[in-house]
Amino acid sequence: MSAQKSGLHPRNRHQHRYDLAALCQTTPELTSFLIRTPAGEQSVDFANPQAVKALNKALLAHFYAVTHWDIPPGFLCPPVPGRADYIHHLADLLGETTGSIPAQATILDVGVGANCIYPLIGVHEYGWRFTGSEVSDAAMSSAQAIIQANTGLSRAIRLRRQKDPAAIFTGIIHKNEFYDATLCNPPFHDSAAAARAGSERKRRNLGQNKDDALNFGGQQQELWCEGGEVAFIKKMIAESQSFRRQVLWFTTLVSRGENLPPLYRALTEAGAVKVVKKEMAQGQKQSRFIAWTFMDDDQRRRFITRKR
C-alpha cells in the first residue's frame, strides 16, 4: 500500500510514494541510484546529485511526457512535486473568476531557469502557453535545448532574454501583450555567504561529503540577490504597477512566513485591489505564494472575456 504525501494539492500527480519500478522502466539510468534504507525499503540516494537529477528526469518523462530533459552542472534541480503544487494552486486561482480553469491561459515565468520546470508541468497539465524570462545565457540555452528536444513544446513555450538584470517585467512584457498570470521562484538569500551557508546546511542534512556537488545546486541569480527575497519581491511589486492592465494576477513564492508583513505593506502602498495568499505543504515543508491584482471583480471578468 502506498503512503500518501501530506498536504499536496488534490490534482497533484505525486500524492503517493514514488513507484520506483515504473520510474526505472521509464528511465533505466535511475536503477543505478537505488539504495536500501535502514528499514529495508528501496529508495533513491538523495545525497547523490546525479541520483536526484535521474529521478527528476524519470518523473518528467513518466508523468509529463517530457522525454528529453537535462540541466548543466551547478544549476537548480527542483523537487517536481512542489513545483507541480504551485501550478495547480495557480490554476485554482485563475478559475475563481469564471468558475472554471482556463484552457488557454498565458503565463509569464519570471526566471524560467535551466530546468524550465514550471512551463513543462503547466503545458502538460492545462495546455497553457508560457513565456519564460531569464538573465543567464547558460540557463536560457539549457531551457531552449529542452524545449527543442521535445515535440510540441516550441509551440507552447517561448523564451525571452532579460537584458537588464535589475529589471523584472520591463523589457519582457511587450506592448499589447496580456497575461493571465505571472509566477516566480525568487532568490531567497541576501548574499553569497548566506547562500553558501544554506547549501552547507542542506549538504549536512543529506550526509554529503564536502566534495559532493549539491543536490539542488544553484547559480548566483537563482539563490541570492542584494536585499534577499523581500527586496526582490518589493521590486516586483513596484514594477507590476506599470503592467496593471496587462496582467490579471501577479504571483510569487515566498519562502518564509515572516517575510509577508513587509510585502503586504508594499502591496497596499502600490494600490493592489486584491491580495491572496495560497498555502502549500509538501510533507513537513511549508510554503506559500502570494498573488495580487490591480483589477476589481468586474474588471477581471472583462479582462478574461476580451482575452478569450
Swiss-Prot record:
SUPFAM superfamilies: S-adenosyl-L-methionine-dependent methyltransferases. It is found in: Cytoplasm. Keywords: Cytoplasm, Methyltransferase, rRNA processing, S-adenosyl-L-methionine, Transferase. GO terms for biological process: rRNA base methylation. Pfam families: Methyltransf_10. GO terms for cellular component: cytoplasm. Its EC number is 2.1.1.181. One of its GO terms (molecular function) is 23S rRNA (adenine(1618)-N(6))-methyltransferase activity. It catalyses: adenosine(1618) in 23S rRNA + S-adenosyl-L-methionine = N(6)-methyladenosine(1618) in 23S rRNA + S-adenosyl-L-homocysteine + H(+). Its main location: cytoplasm. The keyword Cytoplasm applies. Belongs to the methyltransferase superfamily. METTL16/RlmF family. Specifically methylates the adenine in position 1618 of 23S rRNA. This is Ribosomal RNA large subunit methyltransferase F. It comes from Salmonella schwarzengrund (strain CVM19633). The lineage of its organism: Bacteria, Pseudomonadati, Pseudomonadota, Gammaproteobacteria, Enterobacterales.
